[in-house]
Amino acid sequence: MSKARVYADVNVLRPKEYWDYEALTVQWGEQDDYEVVRKVGRGKYSEVFEGINVNNNEKCIIKILKPVKKKKIKREIKILQNLCGGPNIVKLLDIVRDQHSKTPSLIFEYVNNTDFKVLYPTLTDYDIRYYIYELLKALDYCHSQGIMHRDVKPHNVMIDHELRKLRLIDWGLAEFYHPGKEYNVRVASRYFKGPELLVDLQDYDYSLDMWSLGCMFAGMIFRKEPFFYGHDNHDQLVKIAKVLGTEALNAYLNKYHIELDPQLEALVGRHSRKPWSKFINADNQHLVSPEAVDFLDKLLRYDHQDRLTAREAMAHPYFLQVRAAENSRARPQ
């Protein structure tokens, strides 16, 4: 059995009410308090709008959920309630439903996001360090509360660059971590899926989020979005193997007694490890430092138990400047 290196027993030690989302009784608010202003996005499970709270004229985000199992909606709500107030976690303000259709909507705090395809190419070396550090705060917090996000990707990281404010959003795939539990591997978005999902290892843990973060980080520093560009789940593992090599992949599979299905094994083939230096070019060299590469290398590991935890990641030398700036703000001279 594989078990998380950190925060493994959070839900074992908490009362059942904390993680038993199926028992949740939803307190419905008043739908008429909110009006839709404009559509800002859509996902597989929802449509998202900028809205306004008509009582105080404050902007908000309205996430109208598509017909999905009640259980899944309860899970998302319970997780958002448990995490509310945590660093850089999007705040759930209200839950309402349509009187007639019974369609539920989640009301969130407003974030003036710039699309990552526009924002990321403009970010400086320091900006990337700053925002990844802010994202790590959210991940360490949710992990410390016994929750895996399971869908970390640029689309789910809202950044208001003017205010230098980051929020981790879309907790629809998030789940409570219970040691030894076997989870669905059909989570996360293809380019950000950890090897554990691609080889069908079900007793994964928080470290899945650290792989996704690594993919996101690689895309940012190498200006290659997405970094691992697979055309389907099998091809996704092939793309990873062409960078990390097949020797380390086989060591991983052997350690956890995993057999690849023969078709996938044939597709993966044999590849040597590609050094990170091969991804450096004139366009991205100003973002790639030895510390950045060392940090990336400690995230993008096949073996989920070898990856940095969010807390360990925050202590990495790559964030030295960010930590120094934070400390001087906390203790003004």
Curated annotation (Swiss-Prot):
Broadest EC class assigned to this enzyme: transferase
Taxonomic lineage from the root: Eukaryota, Viridiplantae, Streptophyta, Embryophyta, Tracheophyta
GO CC annotation terms, alphabetical: cytosol; nucleus; protein kinase CK2 complex
Record's signal peptide: none
Subunit organization: Monomer.
Binding site for ATP: 40-48, 63
Entry keyword annotation includes Nucleotide-binding: yes
InterPro entries: CK2_alpha, Kinase-like_dom_sf, Prot_kinase_dom, Protein_kinase_ATP_BS, Ser/Thr_kinase_AS
Protein's name according to its UniProt entry: Casein kinase II subunit alpha-2
Catalyzed chemical reaction(s): L-seryl-[protein] + ATP = O-phospho-L-seryl-[protein] + ADP + H(+); L-threonyl-[protein] + ATP = O-phospho-L-threonyl-[protein] + ADP + H(+)
PANTHER family in alphabetical order: CASEIN KINASE II SUBUNIT ALPHA (PTHR24054), CASEIN KINASE II SUBUNIT ALPHA-1 (PTHR24054:SF56)
UniProt organism field: Oryza sativa subsp. indica
PTM section of the record: Autophosphorylated.
Enzyme nomenclature, EC number: 2.7.11.1
Alphabetized UniProt keyword annotations: ATP-binding, Cytoplasm, Flowering, Kinase, Nucleotide-binding, Serine/threonine-protein kinase, Transferase
Gene that this sequence comes from: HD6
GO MF entries: ATP binding; protein serine kinase activity; protein serine/threonine kinase activity
Pfam families: Pkinase
SUPFAM superfamilies, alphabetized: Protein kinase-like (PK-like)
